[in-house]
From Swiss-Prot:
Positions of post-translational Deamidated glutamine modification: Q127, Q172
Described purpose of this protein according to its UniProt entry: Is, with PLP, the most abundant protein component of the myelin membrane in the CNS. Has a role in both the formation and stabilization of this compact multilayer arrangement of bilayers. Each splice variant and charge isomer may have a specialized function in the assembly of an optimized, biochemically functional myelin membrane.
Protein's recorded name: Myelin basic protein
Localization of this protein: Myelin membrane
Membrane topology qualifier: Peripheral membrane protein
Amino acid sequence: MASQKRPSQRHGSKYLATASTMDHARHGFLPRHRDTGILDSIGRFFSGDRGAPKRGSGKVPWLKQSRSPLPSHARSRPGLCHMYKDSHTRTTHYGSLPQKSQRTQDENPVVHFFKNIVTPRTPPPSQGKGRGLSLSRFSWGAEGQKPGFGYGGRASDYKSAHKGFKGAYDAQGTLSKIFKLGGRDSRSGSPMARR
């Protein structure tokens, strides 16, 4: 008798489980049925169209609106990761285009890579060539006043704004000037006010 009741209880519990999941699916309580469009669109937003299924492409009208706050170089079809990689390679290729044919045979690729990373920071004219990466670098440096990024235009501002500090700090480099001025600005020029 006990062996006959157990399978009947199992069948009953299975039936109840399937009925409850179907009931949840009908009313939309399972996150699987409700969130697939949002998750697909988020995945497509970050990884591009290659990995996401095509079924939700027509159902999400706000996907194009959510891309609008991005900069104009990231709006085209491939994913954001590819665009940033492309803009990075574009800046290095444009910056080293005349020398590239000579460098690749003579130098180690690692040395070539490090030279390409270091060179776009020092000359300000290279900012016009590689638009996406250097513009983001420049604006980031202007907002956060980070020393390595975009100090080309900021150094002249510092020089013109702080002419009173010139005497002792003229012999030092630009980076040390920015560090010293940043430290003094954060302490809110109290020595100048006392003088």
